[in-house]
């Protein structure tokens, strides 16, 4: 079921497209399968939802694809830092860029910072470490409750479910690049600061970064403060 969150919630009074598809797999027994994919299309109302979540990988209380994800074993994509070997999710919160007021210049400096040691990861890779392509080749899906240790072993009791569910954020997506993501994000921030219209930001966060949108969260974080908190001077790198 392609782009599931753009489907009607109820089809001719027979329920969701997912439930209808599941019903049609019954005759295939254990071989029956339904594949659903989408970027999150339904907004959430509570900007503090993470305060009440029961597990690390649990998604927000949203309908559509996120609800199906939460019903499964909640797998997330992880990278291993080239410097400290600790694992982490490549997420927008780790994305950094220069403090230039020119959006193009700022976006060209986009990079990721390891949440454990601060190691700078450049998308194309450089002499200081591997880039997105290499990290994706070595990446792993972890079920909710599992942990990837520096020695390569995976520990922890992962969630067990009849459904395998996966959430990949846009930072690791093969056909998206960080410069474009940052450009779109900063332009959306600029539009929001000028108009208080969240339409552009919602599109960037959902289809670009693969996140669920919360307008109340956006309204609580104005442009100047957000950019000052996120922008960092790249400076000179050291080995």
Regions found by a protein language model. Name each.
Residues 1-239:
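Short, flexible loop motifs at catalytic/binding sites
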């Amino acid at each position: 079921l392609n782009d599931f969150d753009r489907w009607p919630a109820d089809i001719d009074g027979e329920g969701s497209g997912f439930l209808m598809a599941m019903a049609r797999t019954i005759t295939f027994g254990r071989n029956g399968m339904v594949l659903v994919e989408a970027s999150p299309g339904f907004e959430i109302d509570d900007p503090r939802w993470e305060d009440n979540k029961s597990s690390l990988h649990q998604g927000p209380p949203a309908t559509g694809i996120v609800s199906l994800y939460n019903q499964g074993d909640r797998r997330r994509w992880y990278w291993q830092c080239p410097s400290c070997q600790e694992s982490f999710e490549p997420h927008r919160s780790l994305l950094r860029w220069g403090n230039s007021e020119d959006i193009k210049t700022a976006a060209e400096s986009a990079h990721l910072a390891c949440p454990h040691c601060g190691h700078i990861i450049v998308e194309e890779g450089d002499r200081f470490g591997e880039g997105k392509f290499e990290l994706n080749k070595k990446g792993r899906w972890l079920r909710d409750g599992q942990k990837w240790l520096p020695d390569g072993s995976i520990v922890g009791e992962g969630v067990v479910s009849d459904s395998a569910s996966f959430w990949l954020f846009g930072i690791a997506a093969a056909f998206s690049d960080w410069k474009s993501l940052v450009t779109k994000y900063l332009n959306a921030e600029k539009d929001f600061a000028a108009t208080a219209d969240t339409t552009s930001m919602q599109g960037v966060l959902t289809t670009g970064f693969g996140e669920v949108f919360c307008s109340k969260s956006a309204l609580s974080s104005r442009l100047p403060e957000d950019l000052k908190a996120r922008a960092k001077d790249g400076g000179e790198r050291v080995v």
